[in-house]
Amino acid sequence: DGNGGYWTPQNYGGGYAGPSTLRLGIEKSRNLMTVRLAKDMGMDLVAAYAERFGIYDHLKPYLPMALGAGETTVLRMVTAYSVIANGGRSIEPSLIDRVQDRYGRTVYKHDQRFCADCNTREYDGQAEPQLVDERDQVLDPMTAYQITSMMEGVVQRGTATRVKALGVPVAGKTGTTNDEKDAWFVGFTPDLVCGVYLGYDNPQPMGHGATGGGLAAPVFIDFMKEALKGKKPVDFKVPEG
């Protein structure tokens, strides 16, 4: 730290799990693996990606930041996860989806993607209409899918297994800060991203076992059950390559 002390990261609950794959480390939320990876990559690169995803404006390239030591907002986190869910393309959050006049005509829409043939009234063997998406590609689509697949493992085998109760394809990541002062879960289906944060206005421990998987994930489940009601499950799209 700034006073000449030492920073000693630990896995949640202590202990060392030994060598593991990146996939397993993410599923089990192992801090030490994350820190070693950030050190090998270089924190300048980690900071650059955090800024590219919009999580921070100016992230200091210090190793504790790899475990979320910097402060951000739920909106910024959800926006960053939306980039992954969107195949690596940037997302601009908005409270307004569209505005229509009293005759039902759309006078404004937030989504500016263009589709020349989407209003075709009849299908006669023509090619499927294509959306022209000019949003910035901030992450390679194959990398975005690999990250999605790893975070599906968090739900299937890792720290958020209770989210499997939704019965649809879901990817996500839990988060728990030191002394269990904050609990996070940010997750997504192919169509919807949701972030949950629990903690006091003045940071203080929420109690033993107050983890992202134990506290935040159930809130995510309750919301998604209602949001996805009546919708057919959709698999995550695998990009070419």
Regions found by a protein language model. Name each.
Residues L24-K28, T73-G241:
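A penicillin-recognizing enzyme superfamily signal
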Residues D1-N86:
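Active-site-adjacent helix/loop patches that line small-molecule binding or acyl-intermediate pockets
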